[in-house]
A protein has these predicted regions:
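PAS-family sensory domains
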Residues: 2-9, 32, 70-71
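Core hydrophobic beta-sheet residues of small sensory/regulatory alpha/beta domains
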Residues: 14-18
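Conserved hydrophobic beta-strand signature of PAS-family and PAS-like sensory domains
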Residues: 23-24
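PAS/PAS-like sensory domain cap-loop motif
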Residues: 30-41
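PAS-family sensory/regulatory domains
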Residues: 40-56
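PAS/LOV-family and closely related PAS-like sensory domains
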Residues: 52-91, 100
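Short loop/turn elements at sensory-signaling interfaces that couple input to output
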Residues: 94-109, 114
Length: 115
């Protein structure tokens, strides 16, 4: 999957973030599942959809990738928890990719709820 493919995705929630971990795009399915509108969530940190107990691990992995450029979790299905706008946590399959765009890292993920 590429970032452009994630943007075109309509059946599964998709989110795109910049190299600072700020959300730059979500699709309509993301809005429906997570309860956030694009206007509300674009510009917010990815941690808004990550359980608080996973924030440290997220920051560590994100920083490590930005320093080394070596992925450990990208390009594979990951079973992780996500958080909706109302604070409800749910299990989901995350598939995360990264690409360099104009010399900057960008990230995209599809987040398929496991219900």
């Amino acid at each position: 999957m590429t970032i452009d493919e994630a943007i075109r995705e309509t059946e599964v929630p998709s989110v795109v973030a910049d190299g600072q971990g700020m959300i730059t795009y979500v699709n309509a399915r993301f809005e429906a599942v997570f309860g956030w509108s694009k206007d509300e969530i674009v510009g917010k940190s990815l941690t808004i959809i990550i359980p608080r107990t996973l924030h440290d691990a997220h920051h560590l992995g994100f920083s490590r990738f930005l320093v080394t450029g070596k992925p450990t979790l990208l390009g594979q299905a990951l079973s992780l928890r996500s958080v909706t706008r109302d604070g409800r946590e749910f299990d989901a399959e995350h598939f995360i990719v990264a690409e360099q765009r104009d010399g900057q890292w960008a990230f995209a993920a599809t987040i398929r709820p496991l219900r």
